[in-house]
Amino acid sequence: FLAVVVVALLVGVALLVTGVVLLLTGKLRFAIAEGAGRDVALLEAFALYLGLMTAGLVWGASDLPGGRAVGLPLLVLAFALGIGWPFLGRREGTTTTDIRRALGLHRGRGVLIETLAGVAGYIALLPVMALGILITFTLTRISGADASHPIGDELTGPLAVFILLTSFAAVFAPVSEELMFRGAFFGHLRTRVHWVAAAGIIGVIFGAIHPQGWAGVPAIAMVGFNMAVLRQWRGSIIAPIVAHALNNGTIVLMVGLALR
């Protein structure tokens, strides 16, 4: 396993250096930020999503009436309202096509090309993610804080639960989180500040809302930052979704199989 990680990091470094060189020489270009991203409906959509999602997570993890039976539907509702509001609340003069492009809801250069870009981009940005993991590891060693995900305790349950959790982590979470964080929020924020600053801000917020605690923020923030880089590069949301799914799916499968 360690050998696979080392090889992946080495390949990632090679791809990252190549990408930076191509970018500096003008042979690699980032997508142009869509003007419709300035529509405040995208920011409103993210606020709706974040509020309801937080409520769903808190409700599902607490002793409130219904527990997860209430928390999970709230998560679905959060995504439904979040993805629907930009179209319903768009300002005059903004078309549905404008909103779709602002969210990254298009095929880019084609589904296959964007999917491959997501895989290549994920590997290329592994060194950046490794830096975040190193910071988190250092913080846990110094403070004794626990940066593990609560889902780990449930991966040893019945096979049906394992499959459900894996599907949630590798399908629903990447699709919903990318459309909201890198689609709506990043799509809007990068029209207000430089895209690197927008990616950093969103990365920190992305890390802070996860249940790994404060020590886990650097590692998850780097993941969020990387996904924003992919969105900025491709324009389409497909590559970030693929990279996010690859990240979550790999982690859940490895941890789950190791514990079972």
Task: Explain the meaning of each model-derived region.
Residues 33-57, 118-124, 201-216, 220:
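Hydrophobic alpha-helical transmembrane segments of integral membrane proteins
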Residues 35, 40, 110, 173-174, ...:
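Residue-level recognition of hydrophobic positions within alpha-helical transmembrane segments
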Residues 56-76, 91-173, 191:
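Juxtamembrane helix-loop-helix connectors linking adjacent transmembrane helices
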